[in-house]
Amino acid sequence: MGTKAMTPPVGTTAQRPGGVDEEFNTGCLRFNSTIGALEYYNGSLWIQPGVQEYSTVSSSFSAASGLVYFVNTGGGQVTATLPASPDLGATITFYDIGKTFDSNNLIVSRNGRPIQGDNANLTVNTEGAAFSLCYSGSTYGWRIFSI
């Protein structure tokens, strides 16, 4: 291949491929000229490699690997359901954005996988809590690895 560079397909956000196309698959890589960055298709979304995705939630939700969630339980308890079939090393981060976990808990539903080696859901009731869970395999499941 030498020392030259490879030029990926280039197009705007509006020109992203989609639908039924034999050249459009999970893992497709392109340069998006609208945002001035590389992006790849993960099977459901176009994502920029190395860029963290954030989501603000205030009601129960299904958590996705690789995302950071700003959770507001000001309106009542929120349940975050972990992925049923996580990949080894999958990571999910939660922040108590409203500082209300002490009055309205965050419940992390294990979805059949252990949390810290226990077969029980995780109840978070510490105001201002911020933590990440990383999937370590079937024995210990999801582990808290940063607080």
Residue ranges and their predicted role:
Residues 3-18, 131-133:
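A broadly tuned "polar low-complexity/structure-edge" signature
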Residues 15, 77-78, 116-117:
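Short, solvent-exposed loop/turn segments at secondary-structure junctions
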Residues 18-41, 66-72, 87-98, 120-124, ...:
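Short hydrophobic/aromatic-rich beta-strand motifs
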Residues 30, 45-46, 114:
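Short, solvent-exposed loop/turn motifs
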